[in-house]
Design a protein with these regions (language model features):
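Long, low-complexity, charge-biased intrinsically disordered regions
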Residues: 1-295
Length: 295
């Protein structure tokens, strides 16, 4: 197997049954390229790519602020940070989603926050995605889905991921294309999208001879969305505005392809793609998402 491919370092230990994908060299080159915007002592140690405090500062800049920061290479640095977030640094996807909204109009504060994201990537450059084929019990090559959403107007921010062998094989963090009128609706939208992703991966696994025994679990931290999907409880009938999504999920449940189950928010790894988190929770969820968490 190649040791490097499109700037991704590949470490495959056949005896240990592990596969690790990192971009350490990429981050070193990125810091060298933008070193004039970093402290003289070098990049600072950052624990998160985007802090809750910095997220609150990301508002549309004034004309004066845009003119003052027009010389700063915001779009270039944004592209440099986006590339790893698409392949090996999935935990950075939410930060990139937010910062990308200012690609045509940014101020000095936006650029400074983007530089912090670069510093985070460099500080954690040895990390990536680590897959482990030695899963306890019957979890080897078993798919699991995680779906979460943060209700906001005009469109909610959703995140979903599919995990296999201790790390993510699919990860999406983006705003919904429709307006959600409740938390349950937002969560159900993400559950529906995750169920579609899961079905695609189940079909792929079947084609290569890795059959899934039973339905794939989709973990969620919203009981109302689960009850609606399972056609249980008082909310099950109040789904007119979500009819297509609800029927699709219920059909997949009946066909034994997926089953939604509850997981408390502190363990919900998809939460990392819905909002900026404090360092302790972020690191815990990041390690579980990327394969570095201890079971």
């Amino acid at each position: 197997m190649a040791k490097e491919f499109v700037s991704i370092q590949i470490r495959h230990d056949m005896e240990a049954r592990t596969l690790e994908l990192t971009q350490e060299d990429y981050w070193v080159k990125a810091v060298e390229r933008f070193k004039e915007f970093l402290p003289r002592a070098g990049p600072k140690e950052r624990l998160v790519p985007l802090s809750p405090a910095d997220e609150r500062l990301l508002v549309e800049p004034s004309e004066e602020e845009m003119a003052e920061a027009s010389h700063l290479p915001y779009t270039s640095l944004l592209g440099v940070c986006q590339y790893p977030s698409a392949y090996t640094r999935l935990e950075m996807r939410y930060a990139m989603s937010i910062l990308s909204r200012f690609r045509t109009k940014w101020g000095k504060k936006h650029f400074e926050i983007l530089v912090k994201t670069l510093e985070y990537g460099y500080a954690t450059r040895k990390m990536g995605l680590k897959y482990d084929g030695n899963q306890a019990g019957d979890k080897t090559n078993v798919l699991e889905g995680y779906a979460d959403s943060s209700l906001s107007l005009p469109r909610s921010q959703g995140c979903r991921t599919v995990v296999m062998n201790n790390a993510a094989v699919s990860f999406t963090s983006k705003r919904h294309t429709t307006t959600d009128d409740s938390t349950a609706a937002a969560e159900l939208t993400e559950q529906y999208l995750c169920a579609c992703d899961v079905e695609g991966y189940r079909n792929l696994m079947q084609e290569i001879g890795l059959m899934q025994d039973g339905p794939t679990v989709i973990w969620q931290d919203n009981q109302a969305a689960i009850q609606i999907a399972m056609n249980r409880g008082a909310l099950a009938k109040k789904t007119r505005a979500m009819e297509m999504r609800v029927m699709t999920i219920r059909n997949k449940i009946e066909d034994m392809k997926v089953v939604p189950m509850y997981l408390r928010t502190s363990e919900m790894i998809a939460d990392i793609g819905t909002k900026a988190l404090d360092p302790k929770l972020f690191i815990y969820l990041r390690d579980k998402l990327c394969g570095y968490g201890k079971e």
